[in-house]
Amino acid sequence: MPASIGGLPLPRICPHFLTLRVAIRAHLTDHVHIGLSGGPDSLALVAAARAEGAEVTAICINHNLQEGSAEVSERAAAQAEHMGATALIRSITVPPGSMEAQAREARYAEFAQLTDTIWAGHTMDDQAETFLLAGLRGNPAGMKSASRRPDLTVIRPLLGVRRADTHGACTELGLTPWQDPQNRDRAFRRVAIREQVLPLLAEIHAGDPVPGLALAATRAAMEGEALEFFVDKRRGEWADGFPVRLAAEPHALRRLMLADFLRGHGVRVTSKKIEAVDRLLTHWHGQGGVAVGGGAHGRLEVVRVSGKLEITG
């Protein structure tokens, strides 16, 4: 282990930090870009990547959602630079709507302006919380270690690492991370799950529920990835309308195919729309078309014509 990273000396014995270093090795490249909030997870991730010899560019996003957010970004950037990383600060405007979702999309859009691959500090605990949140929305799913968006790949090297290790690593290295006050506000569902639901599950389960939930999330993510693979392979089948014969496909695969078909025509996909369109395949009795939103030329509608589904509007 190096004696220091930049101007930060490294202690000889630091088991939490070693856990992080081992975890990231499978994802390591010569130069990595890391989304740095200044919190324990991303700060420890920057330190681990630097200790493993990577050149690091830390991208600090000021979402302008909290008082003092500019100072938080500046402090995080200074900490990264002290560890020998390059730091960039970007200020963004988050559109109205679901704050967590809109902030994430705005942040990823900004990352995509700077790199094609970004590391995120999500841990096993985040994975378990995400699985429960997604389940409440009727779509139990997990984060993948590598998520590919149209313009950005998100790498999550710490999904197998506990939050206690990132916090412990910061303590071992003498780093003082930013503690987001919103992480204590139970008005946010994720915080309520973290502070109320998971402790109750631990009591009922008579043990830590996080590893099992995280494993379920990982399996859901892998199964989803397999289905997406088949959709990618078969996309040409619905390039000129969605064939009615695909009604024979398994429901889960057919839903993804329909979602891909709709997105290809600029439709904002929801479960309700997919189910309504699916009935044109599986419960056909001559009914009219299904409205799926507005397009550039007006109302969009899916209709069944001559053995296939078409979008008009």
UniProtKB/Swiss-Prot annotation:
Source organism of the structure: Corynebacterium efficiens (strain DSM 44549 / YS-314 / AJ 12310 / JCM 11189 / NBRC 100395)
SUPFAM superfamilies (alphabetical): Adenine nucleotide alpha hydrolases-like (SSF52402)
Amino acids binding ATP: S37, G38, G39, P40, D41, S42
GO CC terms, sorted: cytoplasm
Gene: tilS
Reaction equations catalysed: cytidine(34) in tRNA(Ile2) + L-lysine + ATP = lysidine(34) in tRNA(Ile2) + AMP + diphosphate + H(+)
GO MF annotation: an example: tRNA(Ile)-lysidine synthase activity
GO biological process: tRNA modification
Highest taxon listed in the record's lineage: Bacteria
HAMAP family (UniProt xref): tRNA_Ile_lys_synt
Protein name: tRNA(Ile)-lysidine synthase
InterPro entries noted in UniProt: Rossmann-like_a/b/a_fold (IPR014729), TilS/TtcA_N (IPR011063), tRNA_Ile_lys_synt (IPR012094), tRNA_Ile_lys_synt_N (IPR012795), tRNA_Ile_lys_synt_subst-bd (IPR015262)
Top enzyme class: ligase
Coiled coil: none
EC number(s) per entry: 6.3.4.19
Signal peptide: none
UniProt remark on domains: The N-terminal region contains the highly conserved SGGXDS motif, predicted to be a P-loop motif involved in ATP binding.
Subcellular location: Cytoplasm
Protein family per UniProt: Belongs to the tRNA(Ile)-lysidine synthase family.
Keyword tRNA processing: yes
Keywords: ATP-binding, Cytoplasm, Ligase, Nucleotide-binding, tRNA processing
Pfam families for this protein: ATP_bind_3 (PF01171), TilS (PF09179)
